[in-house]
Amino acid sequence: MSLPSIGSVGSDRMAAYMHGQQVYTGQFGDPNLTPPQAETQMSAQASAQAVGQEPEPDYKLVIRQEPQRARVAQGKEKGTDRKPIDPPPIVQLIRTARSDPAQIYLQSPYYFMACTLIKGSDDDPDPNPNSMLGTLVSSLHKLRDLNNEDGGFFIFGDLSIKIEGVFRLQFTLFQMKDSTCVFLDSATSQPFTVYPQKNFEGMAESTFLTRSFSDQGVRLRVRKDSRAMTTRKRNHQHAEVAKKHSEWDRKQTSAVSRHSSINENDSTPTDTRGLASFAGAGSSGYYDQHRSHYGETYGHDTYYGGARSVKRARHEVSPGQYALPDLPQQAYATRQPSFSDSVASMTMPPVTTAAPSLAGINPMSSHHGYTGSAHPGFAPHRINTQVGGSHLAPQPHSAIGSVNQGYQSPSTHHQPHPHTAHPAGGQAYPSPSPRQSPGTAPNYHYGSHHSQQTPVSLGLETYTSAGVVGMPGPGQLVGTSAPSPHLGQGYRHGMINEPGA
């Protein structure tokens, strides 16, 4: 019995090994794959063959954001003058779990996508390959999707077209392997229109997907609102401001109207020039220059628009409601008013009869500007009719006149009155000039006693039966006459004219 050779034994073992590989491949698939992957591949192929469909491809492209409009780019624009395609096209790359269950492709730098311009329909001619500007190639970006899951996206945020018409974009996916570039898949967008500059409506507001990717670091132009939307919002804000000003103006006008009605019911005249000017200011101002423009813009009666609101305010606040009382004009025609004039005019009515001349009064003008009557030519002195019809009210100026004898004008000659009683020293008090001009009242010179205000200068009436040194007695009064017919009904009778008149 001969033994088998070593070569024959090796060949038999090799044949048995190959037979086992064939059986394993027929049952479990490719032996180079791990058992779980082999089972997945076998199940996918078996299901596809059972249904009669082709197996699912390893790569899938989904256009997440389609281009809609664009403006023609001249190629000479600088910076933001060149408008890109709106909205920016975004393409997502999806790989099946069978081909890459760990989703390692999201970290791969070897995937990239190129964008080309093609005709919008079959009847249109093919565009020039050099009709596009900007960044035509995009690498893969790993970004978080709206569903909070990671994904791979190709973003074209800087694409412009130099010709008008209707076109489509073709996106082609490539992969770098060693020193070669391998084509993987492609996708085509929907047709969109490229408008000339004069017909372009403007860039629309950025989509939520664009904002989300911009927040994650992708360089994209984010627009909050379009120009048309911004203009509408601005006009709405101006309308709100105009409405507030109109309400405030109506409140001020009603307040002035109520105040004017109160003044009409009051018997005391009130100077309301300040309120009248305030009411006039309510219907005028800076915004009145633009009220016609705002009225045409907003289409309703506001503070700025329409003459109806302004006329209503002027009608409610009429200047005639604030008429001032008539003031005497004679005091302003002859001389300037003084401090004592204003004090006397507040408490005493004007007197139309001449003032009696008193002995010892200095006719010189006071260097302090104090005068003795509220109106020129009149003296605010009244007769005490309660004690006697021919008694004058005591005048404290007669006592002061003896102090001011040295300040009398040298050109004035005084003669003693025949009925004037002499004081104890035997010296007669000089009397004023026989007649003075009716337009000028005697000015009282107080000298060193100018700080002492007399009852007459303060507009007060003094009633007493006692006489004063230097005052004329009851028998010395000359020229008693009735009051002027121009006086009021409430005026007391018994005024005395100036002696010698």
Swiss-Prot record:
The protein's name: Spore development regulator VOSA
Species this protein is from: Pyricularia oryzae (strain 70-15 / ATCC MYA-4617 / FGSC 8958)
Lineage, highest ranks first: Eukaryota, Fungi, Dikarya, Ascomycota, Pezizomycotina
Cited function: Component of the VELB-VOSA heterodimeric complex that plays a dual role in activating genes associated with spore maturation and repressing certain development-associated genes. The complex binds DNA through the DNA-binding domain of VOSA that recognizes an 11-nucleotide consensus sequence 5'-CTGGCCGCGGC-3' consisting of two motifs in the promoters of key developmental regulatory genes. Appears dispensable for the development and pathogenicity.
Keywords: Nucleus, Sporulation, Transcription, Transcription regulation
Recorded GO CC terms: nucleus
Statement: the UniProt record of this protein carries the keyword Iron: no
Domain writeup: The N-terminal velvet domain contains a NF-kappa-B-like fold and is involved in DNA-binding.
Family listed: Belongs to the velvet family. VosA subfamily.
